[in-house]
Amino acid sequence: MGKPDDLSDGPTTVGEMPLATSAIARPKKPFLLEQVAGPGAPRAFTLELDETVFGRSLQANISIESGGISRKHAVVRRAGPEFSVTDLNSANGIYLNGVKTHSAILREGDTLQMGDVVFVFHEGA
């Protein structure tokens, strides 16, 4: 049998690998819509798909039970680093920062309203 390892001499180096000292990789925060008002609030929805449909229908990616929301109310699309929202010809439309719109780019802190449901957009970091 061999002699037991003597660990008192310090650590054994098996191989060396340079470490990056300029930046430490951190996981990215997800892009999300935080629901701040309406049925089910407060809660948050992570935007992971290239297209996320919001609506009352169970076929919507994010289904919200509210009389002010159409079956397929709006879609949030990702194009590279940008997100946009487009109304899908809903009965009540969409409002970005209190202004009715058909389509718009989403920015950090924007409020998006669909019927009686209000979201705040948060960019990943």
Regions found by a protein language model. Give the residues of each.
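Intrinsically disordered, low-complexity acidic Ser/Thr-rich regulatory segments
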Residues: M1-E65
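Forkhead-associated
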Residues: A41-V118
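Solvent-exposed strand-loop boundary residues in beta-sheet-rich modules
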Residues: A37-P39, G80, A125
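Short, Lys/Arg- and Gly-enriched loop/turn segments at beta-strand edges
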Residues: F119-A125
